[in-house]
Amino acid sequence: MTSTDFKLDMSMMLTIHDASRRELGRIAKIAARNDDDPKQILRSAIGWQMFKKYLRIHHTTEDETVWGLMEQKLAEKPDRDLLAAMEAEHAAIDPLLDAIDEALGDRDYGSQRLAGLVDALATSLGAHLKHEEAEGLALIDSTLSQEQWANFAAVHLKRVGDEVGTYLPWLLDSASAEWTDMVLTRLPPHGRVNYEGSWKAAYDELDLWAPTTTG
């Protein structure tokens, strides 16, 4: 699937999905480690905090500016079943994030619970992303106007706020040069200048998943 499959620009949506899958893979690898304490690594990792925050921003903004609006536009139509499924899938993910955080703070049984919870998160979120790409994006594309879709992007960016200089390189971490260039061409000129001038370099200095020896 590419952004050219739609009349609306889905490039950032697909980039967010790819970033979520990438981070899920990294989290799963940490949870499966036996040379360090995965619980300690995740509990203090910048990467875990960023993943949770950006995922919640994305889903909350979708719920409020996309699915909620589409419910009104598609009232009494069969497509509302798909909207209900999207919202239910979102609702199932937040409790898994909370359960993982609880396990990370559980000194007695957290290590035993962690791998199963991470696997449940990967399964739930992975299935949601696949479902949204298979059916949800096409429904968005056929229902929302350019202005309504632009509002989703604007609200999303506002919620990221001052962290945009970290958020954008995080999104594009491990993206191909071609895909990165495509995303950057869709930004205002200063966005590319900042990304190439300082944002990416500062992000590359971060050790998102560094193990720690404290706590």
Q: Residue ranges of each PLM-predicted region?
A:
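Small-residue-biased structural context
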Residues: 1-215
